[in-house]
Regions:
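Alpha-helical transmembrane segments in inner-membrane proteins
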Residues: 2-236
């Protein structure tokens, strides 16, 4: 007996493997949710005031939700780039988009705080413009890397080009910080952007993160079959 006599065997094996992966993913997702909920109740002290405790729980819930969305965006972006460029080593940090996004966000903050004197359009704050700078910086950095990489170049050449520009953008970011170091407030904001923080996350930041992350993940979810085909390569 072989697979040719029973063509359904490979299909059933593939279905079983998908079920196993789905089960593992389900358990991991459940573990993440349970861990996030338990983290809300872990702390160094106990708040006796019920109103203050409710307020504190609300703050921690917003921060946990924003951190969850940020982690989902980082993991999804890595998988998407691995599929698009057909290389398991591809990632936003290697291709330069992470450094480009950081530089774009920092330039936006410098323009708002130094050039415009923190003058943002009515109804909008500086923090609302930071994601715009990050998105523009990441897109421009990726476009530059793709334009400077030969059309028929190997994926390794693309990764090397991205790594070079990632170092260049990181150097420009360090130069920008050194130029504005006399303003300790702006320097603190730039360092917070570089290192990442959810300390100031609230309902508005959560809504903004949800729109950006879910809006980007929806097309990726709809094109998951195409990404799988790209990741499989020409031989398979």
């Amino acid at each position: 007996m072989n697979a040719a006599d029973h063509p359904e065997l490979p299909l059933s094996a593939a279905a079983t493997e998908r079920q196993r992966l789905a089960l593992r993913f389900g358990w991991l997702a459940l573990a993440v949710v349970v861990s996030a909920l338990l983290s809300l109740y872990v702390g160094r002290g106990d708040l006796a005031d019920a109103a203050l405790g409710a307020r504190f729980m609300s703050l921690r819930a917003h921060r946990s939700a924003v951190a969850f969305l940020a982690g989902a965006a980082l993991s999804a972006s890595g998988v998407i780039m691995q599929g698009l460029f057909r290389n398991p080593l591809a990632s936003p940090s290697i291709l330069g988009t992470t450094a480009g996004a950081q530089l774009g966000g920092e330039l936006m903050l410098v323009v708002l705080y130094v050039v415009l004197g923190n003058l943002a359009p009515a109804g909008l704050s500086a923090e609302m413009f930071t994601p715009i700078g990050c998105v523009l910086g990441s897109l421009l950095s990726l476009i530059v890397v793709l334009l400077l990489t030969p059309l028929r170049a190997s994926p390794v050449s693309l990764l090397l080009t991205g790594f070079l520009f990632s170092s260049l953008f990181a150097s420009l970011s360090a130069l920008l910080k050194s130029l504005v170091q006399e303003s300790w407030q702006l320097t603190r904001v730039l360092n917070t952007l570089s290192l990442g923080s959810v300390s100031g996350a609230g309902p508005r930041q959560l809504a903004l993160a949800a729109v950006l992350v879910l809006g980007a993940l929806l097309p990726a979810w709809l094109w998951w079959r195409e990404l799988d085909v790209l990741m499989s390569g020409e031989e398979e």
